[in-house]
Design a protein with these regions (language model features):
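A short, structure-level motif marking secondary-structure boundaries and short turns
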Residues: 30-32, 57-59, 90-91
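A short alpha-helix capping/helix-coil boundary motif
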Residues: 24-26, 51-54, 83-85
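Phosphate/pyrophosphate-binding loops at sites that engage ATP/ADP/AMP, CoA/4′-phosphopantetheine
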Residues: 44-61, 109-114
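Claisen-condensing/thiolase-fold acyl-transfer catalytic domains that form or cleave C-C bonds
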Residues: 39, 61-141
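Non-catalytic alpha-helical scaffold/packing segments enriched in small hydrophobic residues
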Residues: 13, 37, 41-49, 59, ...
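Condensing-enzyme catalytic core mediating Claisen C-C bond formation in acyl metabolism
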Residues: 1-40, 44, 126, 138-141
Length: 141
């Protein structure tokens, strides 16, 4: 649903060979399509990992989603009728840190003392190729 290309000063440095390109090649993404995908995938993924582990949302201390967009997480919280306090967000401080967003969030939770040994966390991500995945983690210091 979206294509990625590059066009900016220095873009020739990123060209790794192959046919010569001419013209502009800006990075583009169909944000609305990605949003629709994410707000559908995140709750499905969470339900899948909870079902597989025979847990419920109430069994989790934290849900750490890919930190792509605060509105995506807020939409999922509403769709799940969940407690927003369980859904960790740090985009206001770091923005979208791409593939590192879940590890960065987990580290931040641990370093600030909000993540305690024995707590159960769902990590739910989505990304390139419109893929998604999740896991349940029990934190051990």
């Amino acid at each position: 649903p979206f294509a990625l290309t590059l066009g900016a000063r220095g873009s020739d440095v990123l060209h790794a060979g192959g046919p010569d390109r001419t013209g502009s090649a800006p990075i583009t993404m169909d944000g609305k399509a990605v949003f629709r995908f994410a707000v559908d995938a995140l709750p499905k993924c969470l339900h899948t990992v909870l079902d597989e582990t025979q847990l419920t949302l109430d069994d989790l201390e934290w849900v750490v989603c890919h930190q792509a967009n605060s509105r995506i997480i807020d939409h999922c919280v509403r769709a799940l009728k969940a407690d927003p306090a369980k859904f960790y967000k740090n985009m206001d401080r770091h923005g979208n840190t791409s593939a590192a967003s879940i590890p960065v969030a987990l580290n931040e939770l641990a370093e600030t003392g909000q993540l305690q040994p024995g707590q159960t966390i769902a990590c739910i991500g989505f990304g390139g190729g419109l893929t998604w995945g999740g896991m349940i983690v029990e934190y051990k210091k």
